[in-house]
Design a protein with these regions (language model features):
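Catalytic beta-strand/loop cores that center a nucleophilic Ser/Cys/Thr
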Residues: 18, 138-189
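A glycine-rich, often tryptophan-bearing local segment used as a flexible ligand/cofactor-contacting loop or short
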Residues: 77, 82-160
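Aromatic-Pro/Gly-enriched surface loop or interdomain linker
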Residues: 1-67
Length: 189
């Protein structure tokens, strides 16, 4: 029984299904252990998990029609998150249309990360977070208050984000769920 259909979006799609964030027989690497747990959690969750690539979306944007949630997981400018695939208007339009029509989007790490047209995270305005790379140092950033949310209701301990991410900040309107030393670790928009 599966309650939702989840798509993991990366450059490989089905080619590396379930092998995401594993290198050389799943040896521990500081750079990817923070993400491996997401894929592991999906393997035991009641979701129908599909691995799709950016080329799959280019070929047929309707591939997203039967998906409930898209996950984009990893560091910026890697095959995990897509790098310059996020400069392709067809990709951005298809994913934003999916979200506009009620689909969920969960980003972990630096999702949609690629410096382009004034943004580092190409879906920053959708996710409600952006990474400070030096281009927005002059912009005021007042959204630092943490909020309660149903996502954290069952958490009895401090959430472990692994390595976490530095220099992430919330845009106006986003709700910060966890920030550490004014670096957003979890937010909803």
């Amino acid at each position: 029984y599966c309650i939702k259909k989840v798509a993991v979006l990366n450059c490989w799609g089905k080619m590396r299904a379930w092998g995401n964030h594993m290198v050389h027989h799943a040896i521990y690497y500081k750079q990817n252990y923070s993400y491996a747990g997401v894929i592991e959690a999906l393997s035991g969750a009641p979701f129908d998990v599909k691995f799709i690539s950016f080329d799959d979306i280019r070929k047929d944007p309707h591939i997203l029609d039967d998906i409930d949630v898209i996950l984009n997981i990893g560091d910026a400018d890697t095959a995990y998150t897509g790098g310059d695939n996020w400069t392709d208007e067809k990709i951005v339009t298809a994913v934003k249309k999916f979200i506009y029509n009620g689909g969920g989007f969960i980003g972990v790490g630096e999702p949609t990360g690629h410096q382009y047209q004034g943004h580092f995270l190409q879906l920053a305005t959708v996710m409600g977070v952006e990474k400070e790379t030096g281009f927005t140092l002059n912009a005021d950033k007042y959204n630092w208050e943490e909020h309660d949310h149903f996502i954290k209701e069952d958490c009895t301990k401090e959430i472990d984000f692994g390595e976490g991410k530095k220099s992430m900040f919330a845009l106006d309107g986003a709700a910060i769920l966890v920030q550490r030393e004014k670096e957003v670790q979890m937010a909803v928009n």
